């Protein structure tokens, strides 16, 4: 399945910096749409339906959600939510920052009510010894990451945080599309054949 994603990275940023930045961008986008795109929103049946969420967005810890709602916490909480929210501390790939002492991950996903996850991000690992330890622990082939390891060994990687946001997912949520393919110019959906 093909999709469009916007990725960004900020040197020396914290997770909180990125989360606040994303909240500003999302709220600003929704305000602009309400102000400048009234006619288009009316065509889509969304005029007056877009609400600008309050900041800061609520933050949940993934471990606590799983303990309270079980493995399928995502579907339950997404359906119950009225505004966008963050989920933090998600075990992921080696490049997300992990505190070995606490076992917590310094990362975050943004979820949209009734739709699901739209953005994933994290503070990044930059220290060579931690990257190698995590690659070994997770059984990841180091030769696949030669350049990254070389840069880390030479202390050429700076601390940073960033994220990637699914553009079509965001648009689908705004217009309440039934399927993400409905907001793609040229949807390529596995198993779907379109007549020309």
Short names for language-model regions:
Residues 1-31, 53-196:
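A translation/RNA-centric and nucleic-acid-associated enzymatic feature enriched
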Residues 28-43:
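Flexible helix-coil linker/hinge segments at domain or subdomain boundaries
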Residues 39-55:
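Short, highly charged C-terminal tails/helix-capping segments
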